[in-house]
Structures are given as C-alpha cells and as structure tokens.
Amino acid sequence: MKTELLAPAGSMEALKAAVSAGADAVYLGGAAFGARAYAKNLDEQEILSAIDYVHLRNRKLYLTVNTLLKEEELEEKLYPYLRPYYEQGLDAVIVQDMGVLKAVRSWFPDLDIHASTQMTVTGSAGAHFLESLGATRVVPARELSFAEIQKIHRTTNLEIECFVHGALCYCYSGQCLFSSLIGGRSGNRGRCAQPCRLPYEAYDKDNHRMGELGDRYPLSPKDMCTVELLPEIVKSGIMSLKIEGRMKKPEYTAGVVSIYRKYLDLYEKKPSRFRVLPEDMKKLYELYNRDGFNKSYYTVRNGRDMMALKNEKEQENKKKQRRNEQLFYEIQRDYIETEAKEPISGFLTLYPGQPAFLSAESGKYSVTAEAGMVEPAKKQPLTEERVKTQLEKTGETPFYFKELDVCMDDNCFVPMQTLNELRRGVSDQLVKEMTEPYRRKAAEKPEQEAKASGKPDQESGAEKKMELTASAETRAQWNALLEITEITTIYAGMGCFKREIFEEQAEKGILQAKELGKQVYLMLPHVVREGDLKEYRDTFRCLKEIGLGGFLIRNLESFSFLKEMGMEKDIRLDYSVYTYNSRAQAFWQEQGVQRDTVPYELNEREIGKRDNTNSEMVVYGYLPMMVSAQCVQKNLNGCNHSYSLVRLKDRMGKYFPVKSYCTSCYSVIYNSLPLGLVKEADEIRSMHPAAVRLNFTIETLEETKEIAAAFAGTYCKGIAVPAGREYTKGHFHRKVE
C-alpha cells in the first residue's frame, strides 16, 4: 500500500495549498463536532465542493467528528450533518465517541471509520477491538514507540495513521480535562484553551523549587519534526503520515507538506540516498517551531529534551528575528497562487464540412465533445499553434493538457468560441465522469435504534438502594476504607499491593474485605501500554476464583485484554471510557460491562436526563486533569522512581498535585481542589445512580478516614458533612462548551 501524506485544512485556501504541495489526503472539520472548534473550518457548501476538488485530483478527504457528543447532538444533529457529505462521496469520518462510531456504522455502513487519537489507543489489543467494530484505520496515541506500532501492524489489518509533524500535547489525547475544569472549555469538545502552554512553578514534597533557572513551562512540549525518521516510520507499518495544524495558516501547511512530499518520494524511489538537507530543516524551523523540535515518542519514552521549558525566552528571540520573506514568497507563488491540476490527453480533429471534435482522457476516463462546423478558411487559416494555445487555456478547470494532438486541414477555420465550447465540453464531462462514482444515496435514519433506555421511572429507580463505593491508590487509603461500614465496594489500585508479592497481598486483601462484607475490584492503570498486563494474566484468574469482584478500567487496552480472557462481564468502566450519550452507554452494555461512570463533564441537567441505573457517580475526589507520558519530576529534577508527588503553581497561586505512577511510567496532574458534592446529595439520589463513589488519590490515612466517614454520613444517613474543607463542584452546576 502506498504511503499517504495527510495534511490539515482549516480553510478552503489551506486545503488547496496542501493539495498543490503534494498531500495525498486532507482532513478537516466542519461547522460542528471537530476537535478544532476555533479553527476557521468550512461550511457545508465548501465541504461539498472540497470533496469534489480532491477527488478530481485523485486525493481523499476525511472529516473530523473527533469529539464527545451530548445526547441531543447525536440524536438530532449528527445524521443531517453527515448525510450530504456522505452522499457527495466523503472518504472517511474520524471519530472519538463510541456512540458516534455505533451510529455511523448503522446510518452509513459503507463509510470508512478512522479511530481518532482521542480514543487513546495504546496497544494492539485496543486496536484489534476497534477493528472488530468496523474501524478501518486507527490513529494510535502519539506516545507509542516504533515497536508498539509494529505490533499493531503485525496483529491487525488496520491502516495505521500517525502524526509526524506539528504541535504535541503534554497529555495523552482524549484524557485531558485541564482546560475543561479550570475554564469550562473542553478539549473533548474541540475547545481546548491550552493552559498547558502557560508558565508554572514546580515544587517538590519539601516545598523546594524544582528545575533550572528559567524552567517555567514544564507542560509545554516542543513541536515534533520527524522528517529525518521517514525510513523508520515507513518500515514500522505506518501508512498515513499526518501533519498537525488545522489552526495554522495555508503557508505553513503548504511549506511543511512540500518538504515531507520531497523526502517521502526520495525514500520510496531511492532509499539508499535518503538524507535530509540542512536547508530543508531550516525551512521547517522557520515555518514554525517551539524552542526547536523533538522527534516525538517514536524512539524515547519521555524526557527533558522533548520540552520547551524556557519557551518565554525563545518567543522573545523570535520577535527579534525577521520572517524569511523569500521562503514565504516562494510558498505563496508555488502552492497558494498555483492550484494543482490533473493531466489529461487530448485529440482534436478539424476538417471542413465536419463538426469540430475533441476527445480527452484522464486515467480510465474518456470523453468526447463536438461543436460547430469547420469551414474552409476565407482569409487566414488556423494554425496548429493557435489552436493549441486556445485549447490549453484551461483556466479554473481542474485539468491541464499534458498531451494535445491536433489533426487538421491546412486550410480550415473555426471561431475561438467553438474551441472554447469543446474545451468546456470535455472538462464538464470529465468532472461528471470522475465525481459520479463517489456519489451514493443514504438510507433514511431508522426510527427505532438500540440505545440506553433514557431516564428510568422514578419509582422503579427508587426501589434499588444506592451503594457507596470508594477507590484507593495506597495501602494506607485501603486500610482506612476497610473501616467504613457503609462502603460496599473498594476499588483497589495496583499500588495497594506490592508488586513483588502482588498475588499474595491481593488475595489476603480480598478475603479480609469479604469478612467485612465488602467486595474488591482491581482498579487498573490510567494507561496500559503493550504487554503491561501480561504478567498479571494468571494472577487475575486466581483472584477471580477466590472472590475478586472484577475490574475498574480506564482504557480500551484494559477492556480488550480482559475480553480476550473472557472477563468482559466482570468490568466496570471509569470516567475515561466515555459514555456521554445513550448510544455509548448501550454500546458498552452490549459488550457486557456491569457499570459505567458518569462523565465528569456532564452537568446536573444532563445527568438528570440520563439513565444512571447502571452508572456510578463520583461525588468526592481530586479529578485527574492530565494523564501524561511525561514526568515533571524526571524532567526537572531527574528520575528517582519513587512515585513522587510534586506540585505545580499557576499564575493565580493555585497548586496542582502531580503524581508519578512509576510502574506504568506515566503521571497524572490533579485539580487544585477535590470535587465535593456535599449539599447535592438529595439531588443526586433523585438521579438514581447505582452507586456514588469516593476517589482517594493523594490523601493520607487520616484524611481518607475523615473524608470517607463524613461522606458516608451524608449519603447513607443524611448527616451534613462538617464544614472546614474546601471543595470544587466540578461541572455539576456548569456546562462545558
């Protein structure tokens, strides 16, 4: 399969520039549902025109629907939004939401579905699961190495698309709530405000400032540039090379595409001569960079060299530098002012007494046109040169004559208008012939479709007692939760039991909890990379046999791993396996999972309309804002593999805890204040969740005891939580954009 160069298009001008510069395909967002809601984007008519524009040039167009959709958006707006694009010939849709994937498969069964990087696919098991659902392509997490990507390539038939150039998020895509929680602008809804690019001071557990002088941007990665890695990228099984930048100007898009096109072609034609010239690296640098470039995660796990820690100084230096006007002039001239055209071969015959006749061919397409009658020349006969000059004025058509043969009488004449008619005739016919195969007719949206049932009946919902559950990440928290009688289930993080004697300690813990009338579920990591859970396969089976209730999972990789073991009915979903809408809920119910977790970004009105009878709702806990492969501890003070807890201080003086999870090599940034839905207990009861949950992450044993007892009193006995602690309400009372 030919390697595809995939370019961003935030506008029609950028799309045309990308195609002119050599992109094989473009991806863009429309008026809704895209992950770059603040890009200019294209309206419906522009997208319909864009679909034909790329198809006439033998390219492809993919539409982003890579956000999480709320109920009314999915049920009322998505079908009419997608239908005209589908019927025009849209090549694929890029999705994040399982409800959207389910709907698109139902409504448009022959439309290719690309699983967005927002799905946080981190291994072959997750990729294989998406393939089984009908996805044709996967965009795995940017954090994966060549070896991990090769495993996906070897074990699935999916096309693999990876980012090769542009901005790099600090967080695993799809796992970021930072912008949402501090400002209401959700990255999962395409409205990220990029708080990660702001300055922060880092402090260790002893309150010492971390890092070198000037390390003020610990969450801001450099842009990625992997043109020098193209041979390794192609060999790894990546078939689509994706350039980031729908918010960027057309000059940036065209400039970057042209350089990657040059070197991709060079490698495919003469791999032994592959070498990137310094002047081309300089051009990429001048088009845009952030403290220089990194080569993404393909060959490294993380590290200081990937970060733009001193970004402010670099930006000051940039302001003093003059833009390379010659570079931008050349890009404007070659790719923006000059549109890509498809070559055609033409054959013209002009003989007196016969109609003027022109045939044209483009690939497998062949058309003909006739116009007027050729007359004997009364004065000056037409010359072949004059005829060719007129016909080759293809203007705004998508074609140019690569070859034009003329067979004509030496003494003939036709008006220039006749030649124009011939040219228009073959051009219009070719356009129709080349776009018609892409057209298709959508079926009407089905009246009845499988979804979660909606809000349950008040009385039937009230019959079932709401449980109190809690999660623990440390042994101290575990011990504290065992003492709280009202807690029926404990979700034990892997850190609750020592790795060296994990099975032994976990078995004792399960039996101990059982004696106290509690169930235990293992809470699996936020991120599971290739092979992370392999060593636990036999352990999980043994623990199930002695009474383990099941597993609380945070990602597709964990689900797929357990599904392969036949344990899908022992699974509960955490918040990060999103169930924003009833179709997503129904999808996971069909997969056999026991419960989901109410998404943190839904507000009280939206939760109230939801069927929560198989859902848990988190009412206490420090909410995770970022899950990252990077490590503040390592990047600023060096790796100590000690599960460090550091704090980031923002410009407003707020402190955000950052916890390292060294066994799985990732870190989590938590909100500055814990969620505490205290006064909302009665309202939450009326929403009929199966359980409310307390999440403990950084709390001490004493704090865990005190908080768990207080919330147990409120939710189980109606006792008010004592004043004294400060909480946030999260999104319970405010809507995300």
Where are the regions a protein language model picked out?
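Active-site PLP-lysine loop of aminotransferase-like
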Residues: 122
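Glycine-rich, highly charged phosphate/nucleotide-binding loops
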Residues: 42-47
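Conserved catalytic-core segments of large NTP-driven translation/proteostasis enzymes
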Residues: 119, 577
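Surface-exposed amphipathic alpha-helical tracts and adjacent flexible/coil segments at the periphery
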Residues: 1-21, 25-36, 48-51, 57-86, ...
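A cross-family signal for key residues in well-ordered alpha-helices
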Residues: 102
